[in-house]
Amino acid sequence: MCQSYNNQYKTRYKCLMPTNTYGPNDNYHGLNSHFFPALIKKIHEIKLKNKKNITIWGNGRARRELIFVDDLAEACVYFMNKKVNHNLINIGTGEDQTIKQYTEKLLKILIPDRKVKIKFDLSKPNGTPRKLLDVSLAKKYGWVAKTNFKNSIIETYNSYLDQSYNK
């Protein structure tokens, strides 16, 4: 659609297609949020209740690519100001991990002093087996995600705490 509009009206509109986004002010509702904010909330509840297990949906092998919201915002500004010959550009990190790997990383960052066992609820769906974007075009134009994962998790978690306890 952008391409047709650009051809007809001589505009330079671009469509950026982001991968799964996370960060401050996300939706952490247990039933209608995406897996990552739901996982942050679940880990927080385990931390509060001093639980020794976390249960995640499916077998934990579904793969997801994530991008921190600040990187996505930076990409939007970058490409608004960049002359490009393509109307659709995927925005992401170009790397994915399993749900289990993300769970392990979040546990290590948010509850570093405790060993929590990951259990799998096989009665729940795994979701799409893999969600990973080809970000080679964004890289070709000089854009890459820059945010440190651990720092972005801490910032996101602090936002979750503010959102949850300052209502």
Each language-model region and where it sits:
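Active-site Tyr-X1-5-Lys
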Residues: 1-19, 35-50
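A short, flexible beta-alpha/helix-coil linker loop
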Residues: 20-24, 62-63
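Short beta-loop-alpha junction of Rossmann-like oxidoreductase domains
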Residues: 24-27, 137
